[in-house]
């Protein structure tokens, strides 16, 4: 997933870093 495409279960640093 990319920064603009964050799933509901992803949030915080992982979403910002794009490591979802």
Swiss-Prot record:
Propeptide: 1
Entry keyword set: Cleavage on pair of basic residues, Disulfide bond, Neurotoxin, Secreted, Toxin
Region Disordered, annotated ranges: 1-20
Entry superkingdom: Eukaryota
Gene Ontology MF terms: toxin activity
Record PTM text: Contains 2 disulfide bonds.
This protein's GO CC annotations: extracellular region
Tissue-by-tissue expression: Expressed by the venom duct.
Localization, UniProt: Secreted
Domain notes for this protein: The cysteine framework is XIV (C-C-C-C).
Name of the protein: Conotoxin Cl14b
